[in-house]
Amino acid sequence: MVNLGLRRSASGASPVVVQVWGEAALFTRPELKVERVSYPVMTPSAAVGVLESIYWKPQFRWDVVAIEVLAEIKQFTQRRNETTDLASLAEAVSGRRRVDTVANRVQRNAVCLRDVAYRIHAHAVPDKNSDKPEAAYRDQFRRRVTRGSCFSQPYLGVREFSAFFGDPDDRPAQPITEKLGLMLHSVDHSTTPPSFTWFDAELVNGVLRVPEQGIPATGAA
């Protein structure tokens, strides 16, 4: 792999790397309400979802550093069934309300991505209560990637678009440079309601670099 000069962890370590791919993906832009339109690249929040599907412990969090685009960006349109009846987080946890998906089903157009492939670079950041060093989480993650082990099936933005994963290869990133606009950086679920941070995203020679800190703002994820 090409040395991208990515930021190192607090201990001075390079990021772990995993390669992911799939037949389709949908990384929804939050500013478009009527139709779902995908960003042309995987978002950091979607990358965290993939990483946590492979390996997660409450003693650490994933910090995505960069995402490389390895396949040509191709779009297609799909009509998807969705529901307008959504339970709150408290209702979902308690199970006290049944969501009526049949009575509240709507069809929405979605502009999705076809035949995608990415390399995710990320740090495992231990919290203050962790009894293990950062290296222990990195090594366990790498072993799970090599074995193909995961806690749940990773997906690419939406659950119907499954992701495959494996050790990274030497495939070069696509020579694509494009300003992507505002993109979700992270979600803090410790606040009520959850708070979001954002960043001004740009793809440069096929690489999306993610800043260590996002910009606080209000809005939909």
Question: Where in this protein do the model-derived segments appear?
Answer:
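Beta-strand elements of well-folded, non-transmembrane domains
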Residues: 20-24, 71, 120-128
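Internal, well-folded beta-alpha domain core
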Residues: 82-84, 91-221
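Glycine/small-residue-rich interface belts in oligomeric ring/scaffold proteins
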Residues: 9, 32, 37-81
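A short, structural micro-pattern
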Residues: 12, 61, 112-116
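Residue-level detector of short, conserved catalytic/binding motifs and their immediate flanks
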Residues: 16, 65, 118
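Residue-level signal for secondary-structure boundary sites
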Residues: 26-28, 75, 128-130
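N-terminal, Lys/Arg- and Ser/Thr-rich interaction peptides
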Residues: 5-34, 208
